[in-house]
Regions:
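Alpha/beta-hydrolase-fold serine-hydrolase catalytic core, especially in secreted/extracellular enzymes
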Residues: 302-304, 381-382, 398, 412-417, ...
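Serine-hydrolase-like catalytic core of hydrolytic proteins
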Residues: 35, 55, 90-275, 279, ...
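Substrate-gating cap/lid region and adjacent catalytic-acid/histidine neighborhood
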Residues: 279, 283-465
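Secretory targeting and sorting signals
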Residues: 1-28
């Protein structure tokens, strides 16, 4: 592995132009910033100890007749294409903070490549990242990969794919000649993975060692690739971050997706007739549809015939090594949103959740019939007398906690699986001052592991202890990409053998994830 002590020397060499591509960099042209891909030559930038190539098309723009159509190949280009700026984000509402910008441009199917600037005697592992954002927001370029690539000695590829209605809308009117609607964003991801297989070597990567990893919606997408027959051979390992895909709300059946699409179309058809959908501007479609169906991979058709739960139970999935896990306090982010909503509704900037809010939150999440049992399992008094913390624990455990345990045990029956829990506390808060901190400790909530792996402007800088944990996590993630193994015992059919990842002495340690997240209770609750 490229050690951190070498970075200064690499940076000097890059600045002086002393480094040249090695013979293993198949697409090199003599200038390390210029690479020949299968569609043409791109020129990137030397940035410290890494090379970056941004906005490289991996598919044709999904415009005109290509809107709501399977991904088409990118066209070839002549000359040298500038790859020093990110491509456009795919059309999105920009309402899922802080993960995505608002965008109305469909010419967005691009990848970004970050590679160590130093030569290597052998190809490097490739890590392909699928961003989160509820399948409606986000972009690849927001995840700066310089630390991950340089410290881990890997090639990192981040991907843009179609989102929201343009990526996942299912509707009978969109189905022609036996084609299934929905899953256009998923098809984009497959095309990006094929691009990686064809072009990784040009950037010094090993096309025979590709790790697919994602967070939240990106992880549920990666999970879908695990079970999609046509994703066979496109990756060699998988990392699932906060995306346990055996959750009840992680999958949508084809029948339900079609019902949702018809229902949403009916609501907006007065101003956007279905005959005009292919010629309407992205903004006309993204924003009316943006608050409609739950978007994401659609199961039950030819592309995804089985849900992850069905596939894991029967072993009918791609049996590659898996690293999977969650943040300890996943749904405190959701509770934070509830507190913000109360402050806005009451006009009181200091409003906090009370006992009534706690019970209403349990009723909404679990139904009135089960809320009493959940309240007894998660009494407010056991959570520092904080209704918010008690509600956050119940929501986190009943959702991600239960599913992460179920996911790990199911996967381990068929393939080598490792389980982790990100548990650092405190964690960096959002950098945007408009996101005021909650009245309760945010802890290790949803997305808060990301600044430990990526260079993210959306969060405040890591302190010294957090940087040490970041270095350890980058080692774990990239060593897994290199070898398919983590530095602890794998999960078995009967034991998760999970690792807690936190800063400070003893922060990385074994954790009984099932006990910590009340798994026996949730399993008995049904």
């Amino acid at each position: 592995m490229l050690k951190r002590t070498a970075h200064a020397a690499i940076a000097v060499a890059l600045a002086s132009g002393a480094l040249v591509a090695t013979a293993t960099t198949a697409g090199a042209t003599g200038d390390i910033r210029t690479v020949r891909t299968d569609k043409g030559v791109v020129r990137g930038a030397a940035d410290g100890s890494v090379l970056t190539f941004e906005g490289i098309p991996y598919a044709a723009p999904p415009v005109g007749d290509r809107r709501w159509a399977p991904t088409a190949p990118a066209a070839r280009w002549r000359g040298v294409r500038d790859a020093t700026r990110p491509g456009h984000a795919c059309p999105q509402t920009g309402v899922v903070p802080p993960v995505g910008p608002r965008s109305d441009t469909e010419d967005c199917l691009t990848v970004n490549v970050t590679a160590p600037g130093a030569g290597s005697s052998r190809p490097r592992p490739v890590m392909v990242y699928l961003h989160g954002g509820d399948h409606t927001d986000g972009e690849g370029a927001m995840n700066g990969a310089a630390r991950l690539a340089a410290d881990g000695d890997v090639v990192v590829v981040t991907v843009n794919y179609r989102l929201g209605a343009l990526g996942y809308l299912a509707h009978p009117a969109l189905e022609k000649k036996g084609a299934e609607s929905g899953n256009y964003g998923f098809l984009d991801q497959q095309a990006a993975l094929r691009w990686v297989r064809h072009n990784a070597a040009a950037f010094g990567g090993d096309p025979a060692n590709v790790t697919l990893f994602g967070q939240s919606a990106g992880a549920t997408s990666a999970c879908a690739h695990l079970v999609a027959p046509t994703s066979a051979g496109l990756f060699d390992r998988v990392v699932l971050q906060s995306g346990a895909c055996t959750r009840d709300d992680a999958t949508t059946s084809r029948a339900e997706a079609l019902r949702q699409g018809v229902r949403t179309a009916r609501d907006i058809e007065a101003t956007h007739h279905i005959d005009d959908w292919r010629t309407a501007s992205p903004a006309q479609l993204v924003h009316p549809f943006g608050t409609g169906p739950h978007y994401g991979p659609v199961y039950g058709g030819k592309l995804l015939p089985r849900t992850p739960r069905q596939a894991f139970a029967t072993g009918r999935f791609h049996k590659v090594p898996v690293l999977q896990g969650m943040t300890r306090d996943e749904n405190l982010a959701r509770v934070y949103g509830m507190e913000l909503a109360k402050r806005q509704a009451t006009g009181d900037p200091h409003a906090t959740l009370d006992k009534d809010d706690y019970r209403a939150g349990l009723d909404a999440a679990f139904g009135a019939g089960k809320a009493g049992a959940v309240a007894a399992e998660y009494p407010i008094a056991a959570h520092h007398d904080s209704p918010a913390l008690a509600l956050g624990a119940a929501l986190s455990d009943g959702d991600h906690g239960r599913a992460t345990v179920t996911n790990g045990l199911a996967l381990a029956r068929h393939t080598r699986t490792y389980t982790y829990e990100f548990a650092d506390d405190p964690t960096p808060w959002y950098a945007d001052p408009t996101y005021t901190e909650p009245s309760f400790p945010a802890g290790a909530t949803h997305t808060f592991e990301l600044p430990y792996l990526f260079d993210l402007a959306a969060y405040q800088p890591l302190d010294a202890r957090q940087r040490a944990l970041s270095a350890a996590m980058i080692d774990i993630w990239t060593d897994f990409a290199r070898t398919g193994r983590a530095p602890w015992k794998p999960t078995t059919e009967s034991a998760l053998n999970a690792r807690s990842l936190a800063s400070g002495p003893g922060g990385i340690r074994p954790v009984d994830l099932a006990k910590e997240h009340h798994y026996p209770f949730w399993k008995s609750l049904g």
